[in-house]
């Protein structure tokens, strides 16, 4: 199965307070055939997640009101979404940041600025496979 075929129709949520990051990720993902749900911060994401039920979630760490660690922890505590893969997005690449992300339940860590290939590879790693 080709990479594009594997990603076709996969619903991905991008949670980031930067419009530039949200739009860049959206362009890359839509070109690959994904459905994209955008959220400006953790509160916005929590309001949308139940309605849209994304297959993969990307979450920025440094956001106003509810940071990425808090957002991740709340998503992972919800029985319905605890198994949804969540990938932290951050310009910080320290060991402590990665460890803290794991402690709250993140499945992977992607450093910003990300490339189209690294973003799509992360989705492909966690995208549900068709039977």
Feature-to-residue mapping (PLM):
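Charged docking surfaces used in two-component/phosphorelay signaling
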Residues: 23-31
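Short hydrophobic/Thr-rich beta-strand motif most characteristic of the beta2 strand and flanking loop
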Residues: 33-40, 48
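Active-site beta3 strand of CheY-like receiver
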Residues: 52-58
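Receiver (REC) domain active-site loop signature in two-component systems and cognate sites
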Residues: 63
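C-terminal output helix
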Residues: 114-124
């Amino acid at each position: 199965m080709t990479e594009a075929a594997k990603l076709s129709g996969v619903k991905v949520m991008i949670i980031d307070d930067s419009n530039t990051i949200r739009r860049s990720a959206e362009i890359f993902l839509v070109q690959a055939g994904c459905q994209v749900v955008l959220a400006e911060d953790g509160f916005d994401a929590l309001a949308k997640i139940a309605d849209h039920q994304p297959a993969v979630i990307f979450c920025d760490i440094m956001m106003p009101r509810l940071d990425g660690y808090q957002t991740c922890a709340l998503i992972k505590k919800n029985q319905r979404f605890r198994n949804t893969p969540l990938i932290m997005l951050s310009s910080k690449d320290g060991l402590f940041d990665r460890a803290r992300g794991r402690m709250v339940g993140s499945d992977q860590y992607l450093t910003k600025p990300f490339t189209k290939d690294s973003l799509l590879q992360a989705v492909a790693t966690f995208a549900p496979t068709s039977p």
